[in-house]
């Protein structure tokens, strides 16, 4: 036990490291001019920077999955090849369903994440803040490749409308059942669909201040 209400366990018990991802929610302008000058001119905000980084991970993920599918097919294991491809399709279906109200769909033949909207091709940098936020979260979970990960999120409800907030945890656990989620939130909508028992109030884990005298 570590403090009140918090317990740390690792599987296996002798694990030497923990894979983790950190997702930041605020879509504020990049303040580091040096970083901004080295990137695509369309990368203007912190969410844009996360998308830019994730695009690189997404390319690596696709190459890795393709190699494993080829190996499975060469070994005569077609069901395994189908299982490997199904997760990416599930991610694409999720995004298409979430963005359906604005008519955006993922271009499934593109190597990078791109969208079609009424015949016009869009980059992810042209999405709304809420759409960027949801894309960052779900793409992060996808490229974790079903591995055990610690997913840290600070107020992920920022910019997400209420329906998306209610679906968020279920979407994450569907894409990667091996992800452990730790998040801070002020939104009851995030935890109202069966997650109330997993909530820890900050007051339960605060360390009492002692008199320094």
Regions found by a protein language model. Give the residues of each.
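Phosphate-coordinating catalytic segments in nucleotide- and nucleic-acid-processing enzymes
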Residues: 1-123
């Amino acid at each position: 036990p570590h403090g009140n209400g918090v317990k740390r366990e690792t599987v296996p018990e002798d694990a030497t490291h923990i894979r983790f991802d950190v997702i930041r929610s605020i879509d504020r302008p990049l303040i580091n001019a040096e970083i901004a000058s080295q990137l695509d001119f369309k990368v203007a905000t912190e969410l844009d920077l996360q998308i830019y980084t994730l695009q690189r991970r997404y390319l690596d993920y696709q190459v890795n999955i393709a190699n494993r599918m080829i190996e499975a097919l060469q070994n005569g294991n077609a069901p395994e090849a189908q299982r490997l491809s199904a997760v990416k399709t599930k991610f694409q279906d999720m995004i298409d369903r979430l963005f359906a109200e604005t008519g955006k769909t993922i271009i499934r033949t593109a190597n990078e994440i791109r969208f079609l909207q009424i015949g016009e091709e869009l980059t992810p940098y042209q999405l709304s803040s809420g759409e960027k936020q949801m894309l960052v979260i779900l793409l992060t979970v996808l490229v974790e490749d079903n591995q055990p990960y610690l997913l840290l999120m600070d107020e992920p409800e920022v910019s997400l409308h209420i329906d998306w907030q209610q679906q968020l945890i279920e979407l994450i656990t569907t894409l990667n059942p091996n992800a452990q989620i730790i998040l801070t939130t002020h939104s009851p909508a995030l935890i109202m669909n069966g997650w109330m028992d997993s909530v820890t109030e900050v007051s339960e884990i605060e360390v009492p201040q002692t008199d320094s005298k």
